[in-house]
UniProtKB/Swiss-Prot annotation:
Note accompanying the cofactor annotation: Binds 1 zinc ion.
Molecular-function GO terms, alphabetical: metalloendopeptidase activity; RNA endonuclease activity; zinc ion binding
Lineage: Bacteria, Pseudomonadati, Pseudomonadota, Alphaproteobacteria, Hyphomicrobiales
Principal place of residence: cytoplasm
Chain sites annotated for binding Zn(2+): H118, H122, H128
Gene Ontology BP annotations: rRNA processing
The protein, known as: Endoribonuclease YbeY
InterPro entries membership: MetalPrtase_cat_dom_sf_prd, YbeY, YbeY_CS
Length: 158
């Protein structure tokens, strides 16, 4: 079981319960898919705005702009490692997710779910630094999102 902590820090986000439910469903689907159902850990999600995300992105990545999602693993994991007591933190910027969903003709909830899945996979050691890593991570995202009844987010991009 993984404990989920949600913090909503800006206006415009749906209620905390809905964000918790989306996160819980995504997390359970990921952990089942990766055969990690028995892991005991904790994850924190901060739902914020572009202004705060740009500050965090500048501080931690040297990029003075907002982004959709950032993940901060509590401990560095390699793919396949079992997480420790704290999985890590995920930060999501509302305006960026809304704009991307509109530009890609996706529902906000589906795109938000994708960003949560993407962030959790980063916490579990998955990356997209190389073409091979990106292909592997995208394929995993596709499979997980399909289980969540969400269309392939990369279909139009391929």
């Amino acid at each position: 079981m993984i404990t989920i902590d949600i913090l909503v820090e800006s206006d415009g986000w749906n209620d905390e319960k809905m964000l918790y439910n989306i996160t819980e469903k995504a997390l359970k689907t990921i952990m089942h898919h990766l055969s990690l159902e028995n892991v005991v850990s904790e994850i924190s999600l901060l739902f914020t705005d572009d202004k705060h995300m740009a500050q965090i992105n500048a501080q931690w990545r040297g990029k003075n702009k907002s982004t959709n999602v950032l993940s901060f693993p509590a401990f560095p994991l390699k793919v396949g490692d079992s997480p420790g007591p704290m999985l890590g933190d995920i930060i999501i910027a509302r305006e960026t997710v809304v704009l991307e969903a509109e530009n890609e003709a996706k529902s906000f909830q589906d795109h938000l779910t994708h960003m949560i899945v993407h962030g959790i996979l980063h916490l579990l050691g998955y990356n997209h630094e190389t073409n091979e890593e990106a292909s592997h991570m995208e394929e995993l995202e596709r499979k997980i999102l399909q289980k969540l009844s969400i269309k392939d987010p990369y279909a139009e991009l391929s």
